[in-house]
Amino acid sequence: YTAKGGNVCFVAGTQVETADGSTAIENIKEGDRVFAANPETGEVAYKKVVRKFVNETNELVEVTVNGETIKSTPSHPFYVPQKGWTSAISLRAGDILVLSNGEYVIVEQIQHELLESPIKVYNFEVEDFHTYYVSANADSDEFVLVHNRCGYKPLRQNDYKAVINPDETEAPHAHIFKKASNIGR
């Protein structure tokens, strides 16, 4: 499946932890089993790839951990235990990422890169957990947890209205309203 835009993807050469060992993301196929996790329950398992995406982008974020640089599109979600799912562009040096062995690694550097011309980038949908682990190179044994973002849509500011603490006599809270469209049509 090919689409333009490269919303949430990784560059060719990014390694994915699979049941058959480390595999370059561009070589992942439907039916392959990738190591996945549910960070809410702590459950980990090999899960099947159900769909592959090839996109194009001219914008990347370089996430450096232990001297290795993982290159993704800016909106690709990484799991930060203290923050939850965090887009690559929102990561900061000092953020902690989860490794496939259950340990943690610290983000050393984030760099935003604009390319002169678009390049191919890759992603895929994983059954159940919708997550997988990536690394910068095949020799690494440190794979970080990322979300495939399929079936997951973040709130877009222009689609919603938030009313924060409308009654000051209550504990702090917010009401989120989806903006109506096409009323009366």
Question: Where do the language-model regions lie?
Answer:
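Metal-centered catalytic cores of metalloenzymes
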Residues: 105, 149-185
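HINT superfamily self-processing domains
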Residues: 1-150
